[in-house]
């Protein structure tokens, strides 16, 4: 009887641990319905995540290892990659290729970790033409 009880406890814990294992695969493309974020099946969904600081000021954190760590240790289902446009040592307007490399590292890390990523065009000015080209 004890072994059966232990089996169910372990099984329950494993289900809980694996619930975010394939988060994007499970929920697919997200959209907004009214005021609610919904998944591919129109079911309400809540994302939990962390924001990276601007890539132009803290580029050392823009890598797949950091994304994986955030997923595992913080149980993130989304990360925000803030692309610094004008400010910092390597802003997008002055170091475009470097900026794209840093952003791509986070995006690839999110894909590998099966979590969502929000790309933030973080600009204190409009830079509309540059934003159109980027997106």
Regions found by a protein language model. Give the residues of each.
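Bacterial Sec-dependent N-terminal signal peptides
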Residues: 1-22
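Active-site mouth of glycoside hydrolases
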Residues: 23-135
């Amino acid at each position: 009887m004890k072994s059966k009880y232990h089996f169910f406890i372990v099984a329950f814990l494993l289900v809980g641990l694996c619930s975010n294992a394939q988060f994007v695969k499970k929920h697919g493309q997200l959209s907004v319905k009214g005021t609610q974020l919904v998944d591919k099946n129109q079911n309400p969904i809540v994302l939990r995540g962390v924001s990276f600081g601007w890539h132009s000021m803290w580029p050392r954190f823009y890598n797949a290892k950091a994304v994986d760590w955030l997923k595992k240790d913080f149980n993130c289902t989304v990360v925000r990659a803030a692309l610094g446009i004008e400010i910092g040592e390597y802003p997008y307007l002055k170091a475009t290729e470097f900026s794209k490399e840093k952003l791509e590292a986070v995006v690839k890390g999110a894909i590998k970790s099966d979590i969502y990523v929000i790309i933030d065009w973080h600009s204190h000015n409009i830079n509309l033409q540059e934003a159109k080209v980027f997106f």
